[in-house]
Amino acid sequence: MMTPFTSKNNNIDNKYYENTNPYDFTQLENFEQRTVLDRIRSENRVPVTGPPGTGKSTVISHSCFDLINEYSPVIVVSPTNAMVNSILAKIDFLAKQANLQLPRGFIIRYGNLSELSYSHSCLKEKYSIDDLVQQRCCSSSAYLVDKITAGRDYIHNARIILTTDYSAKDLGNVVQAGAVLIDEAGLVRLDRMGMLFSSVRDNNGKIIVIGDDKQLPPPSHDYVANSIFLSIVRNFKPTLLRTEYRYNKDILDLINPYYNYQLVADFSVKEISTADIAKRDYRGTNNNVRKILKHENKTVFVDTDGTSREQRHFINTGEVSIIKDIIDGYQSMGINNIIVTTPYKQQERMLQLYLQKGLRIGTIDKFQGQEDEVTIISMVRSNSKSDYQEALGFVNIPRSCVAFSRSKRKTIIVGDRDTLIKNKFLSKSIDTITRKDGFFIWRY
């Protein structure tokens, strides 16, 4: 059956496409994803939660095509250009999979032209009203006005608009959305969240907030914005995406307590390990490193046993030395996809100073939303006399969740056990690792 896309744009009205909603729920093998799509179709305010790797962007991309006939335009918003491009790539894939030849202007990637890319086949043009206004080469002001008017019409006729929350700040003045899907909603600032809510044209429009309520709040420490997301989650009974498609079961077990043990690892990643990517065995002579690098141990705690004392200002050079040895071991095996992270900026600078250039080094907060094959975490604190708040109050549940969920195949925590067990969340994680034979004391 042939079904038209309804739109004010005559160029689109007169075109017909077979199976305009080809993304029926049976094509999604994941039950939670089908449940979310069903709920988005039937409700106007829907919160969706889930840790990284559970298919939140998959839900967004399918929802776009499911909503366009009744709720056009669908505006998709995410905090960063990288996140927006990731969703665009999934939309592009779905369009190709269904053999849809989307017309010019059907999908718009809205924002600053210098930040955008033509790498996706479904993206025919890039456009920003601000860029038009900033052009000074126009022969007359009337010509400039005509271009701006044409640009506004172009946006009005779009069916799917993708943008960052920053670029979306003036989009509401140009077009009213039938549906707004907010990706990583817990990271969107308060003022921008309000603008996005007001961009929906009426009470019958849809607002879909998607994120992880166990992750960190916005970098600006806009805790009010985060509380809005949490309030939505608490009041509208979110659907949790439970199936993990990114990291193995042992890594999942570290964060599962924070999700009330509701998460499961998909069979495709359940048993993945560094053995899958190692080019050769470790042939070094460091017995500490040899134990830590064993493929069967997918989560490891390296206990410095109080011998690597924390210096002033949240710096621990002993842990830096241990991490250097571990990295050297991995690189000798041909494994270079490694994240090195820490809760503290001072330790971040120390790691950057002493470890080789080109490594991915940063604080836990900076790595939120990123991933790699192996993650090494420097916990720094090593002071048995410190009370809980002084020693580890900064390492809360969201920060722990982010740290533990950066890697696909192996997570290594380096720290002083006697200090870290004062934090009940870290203590639980250390116990989990110990039960899986991943606890090692670094012998000097």
What is the meaning of each model-derived region?
Residues 1-15:
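Interdomain "pre-motor" coupling segment immediately N-terminal to P-loop NTPase/helicase cores
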Residues 16-22, 65, 73-180, 189, ...:
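Conserved P-loop NTPase motor core of helicases/translocases
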Residues 20-29, 311:
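Dynamic helix-loop-helix/coil hinge segments at AAA+ ATPase domain boundaries and subdomain interfaces
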Residues 25-44, 59:
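N-terminal pre-P-loop "Q-motif" helix
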Residues 29-33, 52, 56, 60, ...:
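Phosphate/oxyanion-binding active-site loops and adjacent basic polyanion-contact surfaces
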Residues 43-63, 369:
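Walker A/P-loop
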Residues 46-50, 74-75, 239:
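Conserved beta-strand position immediately N-terminal to the Walker
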Residues 70-72, 80-82, 166-167, 172-444:
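Conserved helicase motor core of SF1/SF2 NTP-dependent helicases
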